[in-house]
A protein has these predicted regions:
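Short Lys/Arg-rich cationic patches that frequently serve as NLS/NoLS or arginine-rich RNA/DNA-binding motifs
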Residues: 188-198, 282-295
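Intrinsically disordered, low-complexity domain-flanking/linker segments in eukaryotic proteins
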Residues: 133-141, 177-207
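N-terminal processing/targeting junctions
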Residues: 127, 177, 182, 243-244, ...
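Short, surface-exposed beta-strand/loop "edge" segments at domain boundaries and coil↔beta transitions
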Residues: 163-168, 178-179, 221-229
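Compact beta-sheet-dominated globular domain cores
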Residues: 213-223, 229-254
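Short linear, low-complexity motifs centered on an aromatic residue
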Residues: 246-270
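Core residues of folded domains in eukaryotic genome-function proteins
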Residues: 154, 211-213
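A surface-exposed partner-binding patch
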Residues: 2-169, 174-176, 205, 252, ...
């Protein structure tokens, strides 16, 4: 088996705003190192062609503060802000030669600041399977002025180029428990509102706009799945999966489709083994929950 590209230490799945702030300058430098490692890895793989990486000049402080004023009370997480200050958006694409034909295959992208725009998002979801033990209390939405109920969670588009669904930076969501060190078990936290589909929110405490936002994925069936606790973790996962088609589905109930699995098996078999092992753990946990519920 060919080794995965060297990406440094695995991201912490339960990172919070304070830890994120302390790590943000280092995280932005690590993002550059990770990108270079993946570029080298891709160029070394037989059949990979036309590896293209583009980035923009960093966003200025005035631009970053303007975004926060425009979308108040939401604030950019420190790691994402540090990334945007170095590179205001990025895109890495590559093609694959297969049976004598070269075609686009991998794509990794982070929106520029101006494209991190609000996404429509319903609130007050519940776990659709009734598995409340899958969810834990997370950052919560802010209280609406003059009311005793929490305002809706908010979401912003993180990757407008994703054709497999929507990648969102979500404020005030409830994250799943049991997430692995790199967020691999995040699919256990799929939740939806009865009558709608969105990340769960809580009204118990705190202000979601002040907390570290998480990264969620909405698949083409409109189901939301937790990806990572921080932007830094998401960036590392994106690179670990080489931007292969439908890689986000490794974190959903649907899982990877057969074609995606074939590409993973060829280009990064270790990653596929991890995905399959985590899915097996998830299925076993689901069986145990059903047995407990039947007692």
């Amino acid at each position: 088996m060919a080794p995965e590209p060297h990406l440094g230490a695995a991201p912490a799945g339960g990172g919070g705003a304070t830890a994120n702030a302390a790590q943000s300058p280092q995280s932005s430098l690590q993002a550059q190192e990770i990108t270079q490692g993946v570029l080298s890895y891709l160029k070394s793989k037989p059949g990979v062609r036309e590896v293209r990486f583009s980035e923009r000049a960093g966003a200025g402080t005035a631009e970053l503060r303007l975004w926060e004023r425009t979308h108040a009370p939401c604030k950019l997480p420190d790691d994402l802000e540090a990334f945007l200050a170095i590179s205001n958006g990025m895109q890495l694409t590559w093609e694959m030669e297969f049976r004598g034909e070269v075609r686009p295959l991998g794509a990794m992208a982070i929106n520029s600041l101006e494209d991190i725009k609000p996404l429509p998002l319903d609130t007050w979801p519940v776990d659709d399977d009734g598995n409340d033990d899958e969810l834990r209390a997370g950052p919560t939405a802010a209280q609406s002025p003059g009311t005793d109920r929490a305002a809706p969670v908010r979401a912003f588009c993180l990757d407008a180029a994703c054709s497999a669904g929507r990648v969102a930076l979500v404020y005030g969501a409830v994250a799943p428990v049991g997430v692995g060190s790199d967020g691999r078990r995040a699919g256990t936290g799929r939740a939806k509102r009865k009558g709608s589909n969105s990340p769960a929110s809580s009204s118990n405490a705190g202000n979601g706009a002040d907390a570290c936002p998480q990264v969620w994925f909405q698949d083409l069936g409109c189901q939301w799945s937790f990806i990572s606790a921080t932007f830094s973790d998401y960036f590392r996962l994106m690179m670990m999966h080489l931007g292969l088609p439908h890689w986000h589905y490794a974190f959903t109930e649907l899982g990877l489709d057969p074609v995606a699995k074939q590409w993973f098996r060829y280009l990064t078999p270790e990653r596929l083994a991890i995905i399959q092992a985590e899915r097996t753990k998830k299925e076993k946990a689901k069986v145990k929950r059903k047995k407990r519920a039947a007692r």
